[in-house]
């Protein structure tokens, strides 16, 4: 194996989401307003407690680590503690780690940062306990809480935090980053491969980068087929065909497409529901039909999340659409 091949292989084995994670706030893509506010905090060295809310892969963890890097320089890891609030060992273990970190000498810095991920996974009682912990150490610790849904964070915590709402990244921002990484890793990325990565990611940069790395393992060319296979994502036209067949009254054809997606392509029922919801306004249907499809999607999603059989519920949804219900 040549030296160049060895370097390329080593690069493929490294996790790209960490390798290409932005190091400073200026490097963060797609959130200019949020970055501007955060830079203002950092420039004054006057952080408040913060709540980062938004979907996965939109830059919440990246912004937290970038803040620490800019405040503490090369020693940032000594003054930054990252925890997962849904740690299976419970909030008591999390609180113990917070206390130990907060009580440790911190070499001249005014405060340290604790980044608490998945804070919305905590029960209301656990969040109340967390609020008391935040108050106890507010003099020398700043908390950055991360969640998918701010509505699941109790008001007493929200009122103590500056809230930043991260939206899914724009397709252009995701595409730009994917092109950059592909060039850096010497990956031949086709245009349809890029489009597929952007579609599969749906604003989630982490998913796009992971998809690129996984698809590149099978060869140096990443095209549409490789992306859809590795990300377990249905092609948009397959979703469109499945729904249109049902709306046209052809349940058999619609069910055949569903069966292929579930069985041959191994796509989860929940993911099919998500893609249906994303794609509904791309279908050539009137508003009344769109409303009917959305109602069926909502009912099916609810039943699946409650534990019902995915295939049965999806087939029932298609049958309902085929009957004009």
Curated annotation (Swiss-Prot):
The keyword ATP-binding is assigned to this record: yes
Annotated residues for binding of ATP: 54-61
CDD domains attached to this UniProt entry: AAA, HLD_clamp_RFC
SUPFAM superfamilies per UniProt: P-loop containing nucleoside triphosphate hydrolases, post-AAA+ oligomerization domain-like
UniProt xrefs under Gene3D superfamilies: 1.10.8.60, 1.20.272.10, P-loop containing nucleotide triphosphate hydrolases
GO terms classed as biological process: DNA repair; DNA-templated DNA replication
GO MF assignments: ATP binding; ATP hydrolysis activity; DNA binding; DNA clamp loader activity
Superkingdom of the organism of origin: Archaea
Any single Gene Ontology cellular-component annotation: DNA replication factor C complex
Subunit structure: Heteromultimer composed of small subunits (RfcS) and large subunits (RfcL).
Family membership: Belongs to the activator 1 small subunits family. RfcS subfamily.
Function: Part of the RFC clamp loader complex which loads the PCNA sliding clamp onto DNA.
Name of the protein described by the UniProt record: Replication factor C small subunit
Name of the gene this protein is made from: rfcS
């Amino acid at each position: 194996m040549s030296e160049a091949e060895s370097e390329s292989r080593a690069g493929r084995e490294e996790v790209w989401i960490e390798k290409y994670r932005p190091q400073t706030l200026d490097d963060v893509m797609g959130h200019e307003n949020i970055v501007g506010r955060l830079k203002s905090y950092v420039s004054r060295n006057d952080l408040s407690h913060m709540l980062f809310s938004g979907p996965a892969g939109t830059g919440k963890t990246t912004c937290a680590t970038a803040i620490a890097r800019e405040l503490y320089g090369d020693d940032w890891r000594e003054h930054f503690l990252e925890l997962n609030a849904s740690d299976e060992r419970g909030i008591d273990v999390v609180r113990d780690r917070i206390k130990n970190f907060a009580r440790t000498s911190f070499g001249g810095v005014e405060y340290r940062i604790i980044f608490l991920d998945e804070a919305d996974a905590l029960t209301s009682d656990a969040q109340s306990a967390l609020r008391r912990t935040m108050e106890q150490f507010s003099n020398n610790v700043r908390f950055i809480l991360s969640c998918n849904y701010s509505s699941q964070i109790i008001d007493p915590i929200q009122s103590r935090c500056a809230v930043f709402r991260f939206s899914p990244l724009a397709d252009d921002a995701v595409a730009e980053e994917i092109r950059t990484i592909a060039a850096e890793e010497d990956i031949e990325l086709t245009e349809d491969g890029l489009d597929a990565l952007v579609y599969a990611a749906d604003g989630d940069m982490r998913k796009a980068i992971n998809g690129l790395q996984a698809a590149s393992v099978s060869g140096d060319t990443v095209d549409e087929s490789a992306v859809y296979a590795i990300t377990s994502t249905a092609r948009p036209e397959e979703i469109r065909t499945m729904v249109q067949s049902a709306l046209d009254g052809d349940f058999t054809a619609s069910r055949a497409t569903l069966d292929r997606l579930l069985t041959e392509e191994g796509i989860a029922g929940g993911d099919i529901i998500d893609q249906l919801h994303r794609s509904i306004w791309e279908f050539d249907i009137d508003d009344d039909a769109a409303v009917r499809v959305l109602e069926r999607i909502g009912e099916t999603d609810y039943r699946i999340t409650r534990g019902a059989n995915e295939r049965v519920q999806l087939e029932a949804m298609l049958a309902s659409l085929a009957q004009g219900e």
